[in-house]
């Protein structure tokens, strides 16, 4: 059984992942409009990955006997500047997401939930692997 504190923290991450998905999709639309179809395609792929993360987190909560929920997802911007500015925003956003995931691992550790720590470490590893791949 997952603790309420950890369940709430993961539910917040689900909402954050959905916001990230919407952000990358909006960036994709913007880049396509500007004529950068390759960048648009890559950003759309990132959007789908963030959506998949949200679903994976929700499934995990449910498997642990908890209640997954999606809170209101804030509106994302629709104008992003130059292609360089777009990718600077992507980088800054991914740094914030990495910190959020690290904080989730810390909550799982504080709750002495080793199964959740193991599950969440998969997201930590993915962030590191993606960083190394894109360098």
Per-range role (PLM):
Residues 10, 43, 87-90, 101, ...:
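Hydrophobic packing residues in well-ordered alpha-helices of helical domains and bundles
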Residues 32, 36, 72-79, 99-126:
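Acidic interhelical loop/turn segments
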Residues 2-7, 72-92:
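Acidic/His metal-coordination segments adjacent to aromatic residues that form catalytic metal sites
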Residues 133-135:
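Conserved small/polar residues in nucleotide/adenosyl-binding loops
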Residues 9-13, 18-25, 98-105:
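A structural feature that tracks compact, well-ordered secondary-structure segments
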Residues 12-15, 19, 45-52, 89-96, ...:
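DHp/HisKA dimerization-phosphoacceptor four-helix bundle of two-component histidine kinases
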């Amino acid at each position: 059984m997952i603790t309420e504190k950890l369940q709430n923290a993961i539910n917040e991450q689900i909402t954050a992942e959905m916001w990230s998905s919407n952000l990358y999709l909006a960036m994709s639309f913007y880049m396509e409009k500007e004529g950068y179809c390759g960048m648009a395609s890559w950003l759309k792929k990132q959007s789908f990955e963030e959506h998949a993360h949200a679903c994976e987190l929700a499934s995990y909560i449910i498997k642990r006997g908890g209640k997954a929920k999606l809170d209101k997802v804030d509106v994302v911007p629709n104008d992003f500047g130059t292609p360089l500015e777009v990718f600077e925003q992507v980088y800054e956003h991914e740094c914030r997401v990495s910190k959020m995931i690290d904080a989730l691992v810390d909550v799982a550790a504080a709750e002495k939930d080793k199964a959740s720590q193991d599950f969440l470490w998969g997201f930590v590893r993915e962030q590191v692997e993606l960083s190394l791949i894109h360098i």
